[in-house]
Amino acid sequence: MDAAEEQRMLEEKVSKALEEARTKLDAALDHLSNGGTEPEKKVWWAEEAAEYSSLLYSLTYGLEDEDPPVPVRKRNAEPTSLVKESAESLRRATELRGKSSLEGYRYLRTTVYKLRQAHHILEKAGAKKR
């Protein structure tokens, strides 16, 4: 297998991982919007899928040493708005992938960060209910 073929295979895996992240993120957003039970699980699944796609993305495009800045944490942020913002970041990451892999990676890391923040808020809220 030559380098070009290996790169093509890696890019296909990134595409599939980004699709899965999108699917799980959409499911989490739908679940949150409709007031489903245990929303923290759906958000966690989306977070894990985004984290995995971020790992594949960084390996595929040689960005392992990049450490994008962390977005400013919003006080009293609502999980639903964080998940919506992460969906927008994921969309931008997917769009920028072919144009600027570094910029796309930054948006992808923002997606992960916001999902992680939403998950943390939901976990705390769930613990308070118990």
Predicted segments, located by residue:
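Short, solvent-exposed, charged loop/turn and helix-capping segments
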Residues: 55-80
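Short terminal alpha-helical segments
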Residues: 2-53, 112, 116
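Residue-level recognition of alpha-helical structural elements
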Residues: 10, 38-42, 75, 100-107
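Short intrinsically disordered terminal tails
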Residues: 1-2, 63, 67, 126-130
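Non-transmembrane amphipathic alpha-helical segments
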Residues: 24-28, 59, 86-89, 93
